[in-house]
């Protein structure tokens, strides 16, 4: 799957879960589980409750995603 197939949404962090995982409410009111991308882990970018984040999702599973940017 290429990067062109990925869907990007903006959302807000609702809950912090273990292992760098978050419950995120998207702009279209869907709630998903998202984990931190490897580049954000490597650079130790912290994500806190209430942060606006950019989430990347695959069209095959719309319940999970990857946090790629923090606003």
Curated annotation (Swiss-Prot):
Domain S1-like, residue spans: 1-71
Gene that specifies this protein: infA
Cellular component, GO, one term: cytosol
Record's function text: One of the essential components for the initiation of protein synthesis. Stabilizes the binding of IF-2 and IF-3 on the 30S subunit to which N-formylmethionyl-tRNA(fMet) subsequently binds. Helps modulate mRNA selection, yielding the 30S pre-initiation complex (PIC). Upon addition of the 50S ribosomal subunit IF-1, IF-2 and IF-3 are released leaving the mature 70S translation initiation complex.
Keywords: Cytoplasm, Initiation factor, Protein biosynthesis, RNA-binding, rRNA-binding
The protein's name in its UniProt record: Translation initiation factor IF-1
Main location: cytoplasm
PROSITE patterns: S1_IF1_TYPE
Annotated InterPro entries: NA-bd_OB-fold, RNA-binding_domain_S1_IF1, TIF_IF1
Signal sequence, renumbered to the chain: none
An example Gene Ontology molecular-function term: translation initiation factor activity
Organismal lineage: Bacteria, Pseudomonadati, Pseudomonadota, Alphaproteobacteria, Rickettsiales
Quaternary state and interactors: Component of the 30S ribosomal translation pre-initiation complex which assembles on the 30S ribosome in the order IF-2 and IF-3, IF-1 and N-formylmethionyl-tRNA(fMet); mRNA recruitment can occur at any time during PIC assembly.
Compartment(s) where it occurs, according to its Swiss-Prot or TrEMBL record: Cytoplasm
Gene3D superfamilies, A to Z: Nucleic acid-binding proteins (2.40.50.140)
PANTHER family referenced in this protein's UniProt entry, alphabetically: TRANSLATION INITIATION FACTOR IF-1, CHLOROPLASTIC (PTHR33370:SF1)
The family this protein is said to belong to: Belongs to the IF-1 family.
């Amino acid at each position: 799957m290429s990067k062109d197939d990925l869907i990007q949404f903006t959302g807000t962090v609702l809950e912090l879960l273990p292992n760098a995982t978050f419950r995120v409410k998207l702009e279209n009111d869907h709630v998903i589980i998202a984990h931190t991308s490897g580049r954000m882990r490597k650079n130790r970018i912290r994500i806190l409750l209430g942060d606006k984040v950019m989430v990347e999702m695959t069209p095959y599973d719309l319940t999970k995603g990857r946090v790629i940017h923090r606003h």
